[in-house]
């Protein structure tokens, strides 16, 4: 019985260690409210593989994460733990980042774009080299006490009780298209929390901001005449679209990728925001500092890039196309 218990405990410990090192100790979907990246977790096949191993040392070596970043963190962790004067928060920070690197995320391939939300930065990698890098603005942090406040809102249904949560979700997708001079379909949440009040305070706000108002799919000819006091924010029957142009909140470029959160990368008409240290200020989408440079990297074709430039009233790089540009202007 003692030997049997020892065998069971050893097997259980080996399985737990394998899962911890190979998959991570935490399921990120349980940690983050807006985590939409597919993550591989332990299953019966992984357990069977551990139990059937004939070389434990080989197994322990094979499950160690091999990424250069992980190995750097391993070295740093050993160094800080050996130094009695090291600050505990540094050890904790390293351990948290090692845990993130254990999560089995989808293969990114040789070329990919990474938006680092805490760092407010975007980097385009190719074969581990950096093609381009720029600042970004991301979604604002959720309101303090959000969990309790959202419960209150769900009970009351009163928008005044609704707490703010504009955090940019964590997701994985593929960039598939560029929209030039985009129209902004204003989300219901922004219409209720911002557009409604702006229109109440200033009857000409909508027309001055190039915002069109629609009712049951039809555009209202004179939105300045709408009597907003007749409508509640909770049951606002209108849809709002901001036309393309200099004042458009999306700027001149919108970069689209599939996701269930209506998130995209885009230009902005508020360039001063990139001078701020804390750039968690958007409603969730990601504003990019250098949209033209990002577009050039994305299309990878000089002719297409010149087409994009001319669509936003910029001269083409190819001087042979200047006649086309002047005619367009």
Q: What do these predicted regions represent?
A:
Residues 8, 12-16, 20, 28-35, ...:
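Well-ordered beta-sheet/strand-loop patches within structured domains
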């Amino acid at each position: 019985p003692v030997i049997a218990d020892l065998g069971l405990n050893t097997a259980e410990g080996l399985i737990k260690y394998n899962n911890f090192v190979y998959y991570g100790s935490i399921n990120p979907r349980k940690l983050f409210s807006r985590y939409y990246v597919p993550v591989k977790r332990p299953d019966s096949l992984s357990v069977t593989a551990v139990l059937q191993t004939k070389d434990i040392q080989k197994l322990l070596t094979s499950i160690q994460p091999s990424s250069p970043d992980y190995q750097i963190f391993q070295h740093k962790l050993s160094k800080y733990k050996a130094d009695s004067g090291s600050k505990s928060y540094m050890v904790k920070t390293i351990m948290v980042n090692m845990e993130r690197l254990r999560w089995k995320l989808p293969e990114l391939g040789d070329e990919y774009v990474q938006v680092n939300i805490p760092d407010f930065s975007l980097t385009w990698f190719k074969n581990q080299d950096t093609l381009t890098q720029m600042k970004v603005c991301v979604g604002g942090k959720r309101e303090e006490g959000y969990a309790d406040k959202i419960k209150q809102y769900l009970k009351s249904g009163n928008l005044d009780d609704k707490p703010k949560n504009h955090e940019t979700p964590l997701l994985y997708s593929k960039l598939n298209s560029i929209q030039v001079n985009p129209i902004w379909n204003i989300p219901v949440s922004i219409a209720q929390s911002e557009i409604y009040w702006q229109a109440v305070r200033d009857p000409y706000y909508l027309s001055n901001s190039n915002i069109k108002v629609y009712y049951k799919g039809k555009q209202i000819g004179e939105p300045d005449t709408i009597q907003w006091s007749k409508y509640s924010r909770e049951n606002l029957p209108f849809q709002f679209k901001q036309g393309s142009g200099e004042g458009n909140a999306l700027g001149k470029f919108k970069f689209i990728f599939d996701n269930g959160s209506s998130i995209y990368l885009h230009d902005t008409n508020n360039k001063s925001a990139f001078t701020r240290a804390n750039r968690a200020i958007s409603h969730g989408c990601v504003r990019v500092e250098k949209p033209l440079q990002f577009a050039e990297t994305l299309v990878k074709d000089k002719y297409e890039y010149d087409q994009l430039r001319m669509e936003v009233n910029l001269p083409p790089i190819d001087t042979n196309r200047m006649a086309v540009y002047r005619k367009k202007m």
